[in-house]
Amino acid sequence: MRSHYCGDVNKSHVGQEVTLVGWVNRSRDLGGVVFLDLRDREGLVQVVYDPDLPEVFNVASTLRAEFCVQVKGVVRARPDSQVNAQMKTGEIEVLGKALTIINSSEPLPLSLDNYQNNSEEQRLKYRYLDLRRPEMAQRLMFRAKVTSAVRRFLDSNGFLDIETPILTKATPEGARDYLVPSRTYKGQFFALPQSPQLFKQLLMMSGFDRYYQIVKCFRDEDLRADRQPEFTQIDIETSFMTSEQVMNKTEEMMRGLFLEMLNVDLGEFPRMTYNEAMRRFGSDKPDLRNPLELVDVADLLKDVEFAVFSGPANDEEGRVAALRIPGGASLSRKQIDDYTKFVGIYGAKGLAWMKLNDLTQGLEGIQSPVLKFLNENIVNEIINRTGAQTGDIILFGADQATVVAESMGALRLKAGEDFNLLEGQWRPLWVVDFPMFEKINGSFHAVHHPFTAPRGVTPQELEANPANRVSDAYDMVLNGCELGGGSVRIHNQEMQSAVFRILGITDEEAKEKFGFLLEALRYGTPPHAGLAFGLDRIIMLMTGASSIRDVMAFPKTTTAACPLTNAPGFANPQQLAELGIAVVKTAKTED
């Protein structure tokens, strides 16, 4: 039905007859001539109908927005005065010779031109219309090109695309599972995979030493702008490769992807340990475009007569950190109060500050509610250590180290945005040497997952002192977003059992949940390592979208619902009876 896409017609086609199909983006009658903007996935082209062909002209005069039509005509160059440089096809137009209305359209329930006026609910309910917008179409086509480039790279490097099961067994991976009841085994359930983690490890044990899969994963968790109940991973696993080799290979892939898709050279990715990232930036995924850093000053404040500072400064688990904001002395008291409320969201009890109005006047040129507790030597050392100058403000976080990192790390990002301090467009890095475990409510939890290998210890040494052990794990970070994370995996049954015990998983529970893995580890398991990238997040960053919902064809809402299909829905009684399931209505509790 077509000879060309609308957006592909150009000056090289002048004089040629073309057949186009698409949707009427806009139609207007100007002085007896009908101008039609025809749209398809590749873009827009202007079609002109004049009265010389009255039958065709009369049909063209009836067109309305979003009619689906076929156009036949001859390509001609526009006069120089009419060239539209903002339009891909702006140098030409098509003189219409024939026109077929394939299907008419009722007035749309949402606007495609002023889409900002559409609610998120409307956009998702009528997603098939929202996707007609050029911006949305371009993002999905960009996504298709990215997945194609990823496949080409991995295929050319000896990786095999192998599918793993979607119906599998529930395993503790951090989030709630989506459960699928079994009709055959009543009362038992499959789980939709949160990742193909265990199956890809089993593939390594099977001898497929380079695996990849672009795969759907499912997590029943609270949603945010960068979370969806179903999402797509670029999943990679290798045998006989070190963490360094895995990082080098996947970095090569990501650098090639940005060069091919955006003509951006990311350069070599710097490496930073987890401890350094938390100390300097208060985050394990630091945005290096932001030049602000947290500076430790606890050693200067241990003896001051101000418990807010001296308390955390003398606490092994406490921290006092300073954050210098260039030009921040211009902040009003209300703005400082707003910052104080902001850090309170992250558990901080307050925010001390010091305005450096004029350093040539010594302490007289400094304004601060805590200045009376500090002598001149301490103030000067804080100024020197932070690199502060006249016109700056220094903000202080003092609390448990975790609270300081989270609150001041978030404030660092906010201040960087507020003061337009971000430098450069793309700043990647690797964060390495993560802790093996973290303690939550007195119990150990895996920082990555229970199958991550520790670095350089025996099972006995790990169990003797789990709190201070480092994992052989690595995260790729770009502009403050984690693109992907991975690790060397445990390939020794004794080590895997030790990790389970540290996590409070008894031998009986481990056998019930992971017996297949523990047995597989007995049969010559090779060393293996891997990584998984969040494809949706990569596309979001590369296209400048504000949410991963804008780079997915049919996403869910922030409450994990689909307004388009009204999913989830109720199952009919017969289906429930076949599954042996009864729905129990819980009474709402009153306050």
Curated annotation (Swiss-Prot):
SUPFAM superfamilies: Class II aaRS and biotin synthetases, GAD domain-like, Nucleic acid-binding proteins
Region feature (Aspartate): 197-200
One annotated GO molecular function: nucleic acid binding
Residues reported in the UniProt entry to bind L-aspartate: E173, R219, H448, R489
InterPro entries assigned to the protein according to its UniProt record, in alphabetical order: Aa-tRNA-synt_II (IPR004364), aa-tRNA-synth_II (IPR006195), aa-tRNA-synth_II/BPL/LPL (IPR045864), Asp-tRNA-ligase_1 (IPR004524), Asp-tRNA-ligase_1_N (IPR047089), Asp/Asn-tRNA-synth_IIb (IPR002312), AspRS_core (IPR047090), GAD-like_sf (IPR004115)
Assigned keywords, A-Z: Aminoacyl-tRNA synthetase, ATP-binding, Cytoplasm, Ligase, Nucleotide-binding, Protein biosynthesis
Reaction it catalyzes: tRNA(Asp) + L-aspartate + ATP = L-aspartyl-tRNA(Asp) + AMP + diphosphate
Cellular component, GO, one term: cytoplasm
Residues holding ATP: R219, D220, E221, Q228, E482, G534, L535, D536, R537
HAMAP family: Asp_tRNA_synth_type1
Family under the similarity heading: Belongs to the class-II aminoacyl-tRNA synthetase family. Type 1 subfamily.
Protein name, per record: Aspartate--tRNA ligase
Organism from which the protein derives: Shewanella oneidensis (strain ATCC 700550 / JCM 31522 / CIP 106686 / LMG 19005 / NCIMB 14063 / MR-1)
Gene (UniProt): aspS
